[in-house]
Amino acid sequence: VVLTVVLLTRGEGGPTPAAPAPTSPSSTTTGPPGVDTTEDATYASARPGYPDRLVVPALDVDAPIRPIRAPDRTLVPPADPQVLGWWADGARPGADTGSALVVGHTVHTGGGALDDLETLAEGDEVLVHSHRGSGEEGPERTESYVVQDVEVYRKGTLARRAADLFSQEVDGRLVLLTCEDWDGTRYLSNVVVTAVPAADEDDSEGTARG
């Protein structure tokens, strides 16, 4: 599934990506009713949860996350600039495959959770706290990511790069998106931050040193 982004900038600074139809939910296999095997319990606790908070220590950000969808193919962040939106039809943070997309408004006068997103640097830490879904067992999770790339794209460039930036076919990663380049009436660009699981980053560094 490819997420195509159409930048409809407004004074509030919210990116509004146009999204495809939701993907089919993945199927799971469970044991017989009333039987909870160790393997089943381990699998349940290992599944990614639903994100409810983003923490970015370098930006002093600790913001709630709400699931958002795109019934009209337009993904709009929550109206409150201190609240972020997670594209619920894409990957969950912690999933092995796919880009988990989190978006938020930028406020040119200040007050948006992602106002300073473009100042992140490679290697900065990003944490996503998740909860279990209704009827799911297992502890709450915290996914640790490391910033890999920070880019600013104009509208046309972002549209051309969307298939790669928001791909659901890549190894699991986190993508943060907000607006940038306020010209007095609207935002002209988007900031896109790509972060990879911290464990993956540690493995790659160990291989490079080896």
Regions found by a protein language model. Name each.
Residues 4-121, 125-210:
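Solvent-exposed, non-transmembrane regions of membrane-associated and secreted proteins
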